[in-house]
């Protein structure tokens, strides 16, 4: 690909990352502070830059970098991969432009993530899919994962950090509430994108649901069965069936909200998911499960209590930690660290204590 084409692609990508139309980009460039050398640009010129018809001048790229809050170097590095084949889940309709924004943001973040791992000499862990022939295979895979990752039978303290420690890249993104999660395999590496704004219990479940999409070969199943198996996988990794049954018993007529709260605090799984699991394992009857849902949908106070989040929030700082580790080991400069963090020199310098 010639340079003007990928520069154009990166300009378009930067605009999409911000969620701007060409009109919005034009207006922002036109209203830049007077202290910044301003190059007047028409909407038509911007369109030609994005399509690779014309190569922008150095001053123009400086202006674009300013409004996008990106280093000029961003425009000269073509993306090494795409997320065109990513599978995503959403609760309701989400705009195509928002989905594209999420994909491009993820691409840009992953480029920086892979780069710092390469600098630190960290080998990538390629994904090996497991063929699922029946529901039993989902239980077995979840059990094997817990064993392979040395999780024991206790709750997972931080799902995102645990996944990243085992080679899965997890990207949190600020987006609309209709977006649940997305998963992809990039150069053999598992990538998961989740909604940053969700409650901890929902983020944990969604991340593991997406991991199910990555680890399980479910090509022979329809969408409904695929989603069911990924939900089962997430539930089993969070709280294994044997542990769940040992705590609740084989058969129950009722389960108290107090008991649900206790398990929720230990395993970081929502009360709704716990009740569903109790029904799935035949601990409660279908009648009691229906009653629970009817009460929740008709009693606002009960619904609020059931859906209340009580688990600590979680995220991962692995990428940031690797950058500062490389900086303190003299593997990179402060300016390179700022680039890899998509930050500025002052922020990087302020975080260097010794």
For the regions a protein language model found, what residue spans apply to each?
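Active-site hotspot residues in diverse enzymes, especially metal/ion-binding acidic/histidine motifs
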Residues: 1-354
């Amino acid at each position: 690909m010639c340079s003007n084409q990928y520069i154009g692609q990166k300009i378009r990508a930067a605009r999409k990352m911000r969620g701007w139309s060409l009109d919005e980009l034009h207006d922002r460039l036109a209203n830049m502070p007077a202290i910044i050398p301003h190059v007047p640009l028409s909407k038509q010129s911007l369109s030609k830059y994005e399509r690779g018809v014309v190569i922008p001048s150095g001053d123009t790229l400086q202006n674009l970098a300013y409004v996008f809050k990106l280093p000029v170097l961003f425009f000269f590095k073509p993306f090494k991969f795409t997320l065109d084949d990513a599978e995503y889940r959403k609760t309701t309709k989400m705009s195509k432009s928002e989905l594209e924004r999420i994909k491009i943001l993820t691409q840009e973040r992953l480029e920086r993530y892979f780069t710092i791992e390469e600098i630190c000499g960290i080998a990538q862990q390629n994904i090996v899919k497991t063929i699922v022939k029946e529901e039993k295979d989902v239980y077995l895979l979840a059990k094997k994962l817990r064993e392979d990752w040395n999780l024991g039978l206790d709750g997972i303290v931080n799902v995102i950090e645990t996944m990243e420690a085992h080679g899965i890249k997890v990207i949190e993104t600020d987006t609309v509430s209709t977006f649940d999660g997305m998963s992809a395999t990039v150069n053999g590496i598992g990538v998961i994108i989740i909604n940053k704004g969700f409650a901890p219990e929902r983020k944990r479940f969604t991340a593991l649901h997406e991991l199910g999409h990555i680890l399980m070969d479910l090509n022979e199943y329809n969408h409904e069965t695929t989603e069911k198996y990924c939900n089962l996988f997430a539930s089993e990794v969070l709280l294994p069936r044997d542990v769940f049954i040992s705590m609740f018993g084989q058969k129950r007529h009722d389960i108290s909200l107090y008991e649900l709260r206790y398990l929720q605090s230990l395993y970081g799984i929502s009360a709704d998911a716990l009740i569903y699991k109790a029904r799935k394992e035949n601990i409660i009857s279908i009648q009691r499960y229906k009653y629970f849902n009817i009460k929740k949908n008709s009693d606002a106070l009960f619904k609020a209590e059931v859906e209340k989040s009580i688990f600590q929030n979680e995220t991962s700082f692995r990428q940031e930690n690797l950058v500062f580790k490389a900086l303190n080991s003299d593997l990179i400069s402060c300016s390179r660290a700022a680039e890899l963090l998509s930050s500025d020199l002052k922020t990087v310098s302020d975080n260097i204590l010794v």
